[in-house]
């Protein structure tokens, strides 16, 4: 800055007191550097005693000779003079301050004011606490730098008095009202004002922040959902079982006890899903299709048991005895014949027989035997008991089909009373046709169980007998 032909460089603090914040006193403070140069110091102009001081940006010819406001300093080289003259163009003029502020002093003041505000303000306080009215204007210049806050508070659209690099970001968005931009009204910010929603109001998100880093304000916790709005878990069992049955082939290698336990679980999960009361009255119960699919899997498993159960154990015992006879025949062929081709074929036959016998023995080890305490059941009795267990489990399946029929009948009556019944009856008809298909499959499996009943068993419990519909 050039004043009266002399170049001066102002520091952020005075050499005499080494303080950047100089309060007003009886006499105007003067730094030692200005006294050494024989000029009047312009550092720390007192707001109380120098209100009539002319702006520094005013040319020296227009200033009063009684109140010089400049400071000069001898420059050691022409490079310093050029650098200082170029740096003077980077100074900013605040519209509310009657003099210019050097960038070094602005940065120092902003750092000190931010530290003082952080130490004095409580947690989550976003705004700067105003100082006393007698404070120096220079100390508050950082708050008024680069933009006119009065236009934001009052809602006026007066242009800024200086070229502001942040003016584009400020004037790009509409200016909010005074009730939203009052920096001391934190009621709406913390939920005190219920009329203005800070989340739905775009002006809050667009307002520029010049007081420092943005502080996240904790929002109110969302209301806890009511019990009726919670997620329903009545259909989780059906979904899990359908996912596990997609392989298909692995389930057929389960033992009989594990197979019956899984079928019972499928029936119970289907009953739980049909008894769910969390659905809406106007929504279509899509879960009934998943229940119908699971019932179809159960019928397929019962069909497999009905086709394999009557002679399962007896056939395995017969295969074991047949394998032993085949081994004896192979041994006799090996001992009597010397032909190479015959020996090779007999060795292949022996290997196949051994593999079959090993697989059958492993299957018998995996298959649990029925017993009653210390009583060892005979093979025929065990086959008969297994058959009765299948029939008891199949009775539960028929009861599930009856519940499905009642459920669809109630659904038909409920949808018939709606304003547009034709729009809902298509879904009911699809479910009803699926039910008819399942009942037809169940009847076929039931006939297989009746045909596979052990011969000579005329004393079967009538409760286990099934009559055709």
Swiss-Prot record:
Residues 82-93 have a biased composition (Polar residues). Residues 104-118 have a biased composition (Low complexity). GO terms for cellular component: nucleus. SUPFAM superfamilies: Zn2/Cys6 DNA-binding domain. The keyword DNA damage does not apply. It is found in: Nucleus. Keywords: DNA-binding, Metal-binding, Nucleus, Transcription, Transcription regulation, Virulence, Zinc. Residues 49-118 are annotated as: Disordered. InterPro entries: OAF3, Zn2-C6_fun-type_DNA-bd_sf, Zn2Cys6_DnaBD. It comes from the Eukaryota. PROSITE patterns: ZN2_CY6_FUNGAL_2 (PS50048). GO terms for molecular function: DNA binding; DNA-binding transcription factor activity, RNA polymerase II-specific; zinc ion binding. Its main location: nucleus. It holds the Pfam family Zn_clus. Transcription factor; part of the gene cluster that mediates the biosynthesis of the phomopsins, a group of hexapeptide mycotoxins which infects lupins and causes lupinosis disease in livestock. May play a role in the regulation of the production of phomopsins. This is Transcription factor phomD. The gene is phomD.
